[in-house]
UniProtKB/Swiss-Prot annotation:
Subcellular location(s) of the protein: Cytoplasm
Example of a GO biological process term: queuosine biosynthetic process
GO annotation, cellular component aspect: cytoplasm
HAMAP family for the chain: QueF_type1 (MF_00818)
Encoding gene per record: queF
Active-site residues from the entry: 50 (thioimide intermediate), 57 (proton donor)
Keywords: Cytoplasm, NADP, Oxidoreductase, Queuosine biosynthesis
Entry's EC annotation: 1.7.1.13
Protein purpose: Catalyzes the NADPH-dependent reduction of 7-cyano-7-deazaguanine (preQ0) to 7-aminomethyl-7-deazaguanine (preQ1).
Native source organism of the sequence: Helicobacter pylori (strain G27)
Protein name per the record: NADPH-dependent 7-cyano-7-deazaguanine reductase
InterPro entries the UniProt entry points to: GTP-CH-I_C/QueF, NADPH_dep_7-cyano-7-deazaG_red, QueF, QueF_type1
Length: 148
């Protein structure tokens, strides 16, 4: 029997929101909290707006995390990332906010966010940020040194 998960997005009609909204994120209980899988999530169609010119910025967002007690529900993550569509923010700020929102939701052992943004004006911006609980600080430092 499947436990009651109380998820709002999965299996429901999907209203797409294009203004940043962290309340769209949902989590479910980690079915194997005794394991340490490194989970990779990739959003190939991330879009936000330049806060100065209001021109669209396009990128690929990579999220990697080691869950503790909760895991992110993928449809809610998709809707959350889509909510950046009309949000004016620099690439680095988007990446930092995504990390902070996911850390608040999941309280993971480790989490990193990497953005590979399309170049504009000949410059490609590729911000990386990561977080770890005390027991994973060494892993965090190694990942930071080896970031793409």
């Amino acid at each position: 029997m499947t436990p009651e998960l109380n998820l709002k997005s999965l299996g429901a009609k999907t209203p797409y929101i294009f203004e940043y909204n962290s309340d769209l994120l949902e989590a479910f209980p980690n079915p194997n909290p005794n394991l340490d899988p490194l989970i990779t999530l990739e959003c190939k169609e991330f879009t936000s707006l330049c806060p100065i010119t209001s021109q669209p910025d396009f990128g690929v967002i990579f999220i990697r995390y080691i869950p503790k007690d909760k895991m992110v529900e993928s449809k809610s993550l998709k809707l959350y990332l889509f909510s950046y569509r009309n949000h004016g923010s620099f690439h680095e700020s988007c990446i930092n906010t995504i990390l902070l929102d996911l850390v608040q939701l999941l309280e993971p052992k480790y989490l990193e966010v990497y953005g590979d943004f399309a170049s504009r004006g000949g410059i490609a911006i590729k911000p990386f940020v990561n977080y770890a609980i005390k027991e994973y600080q060494e892993f965090k430092e190694k990942r930071l040194l080896n970031a793409k």
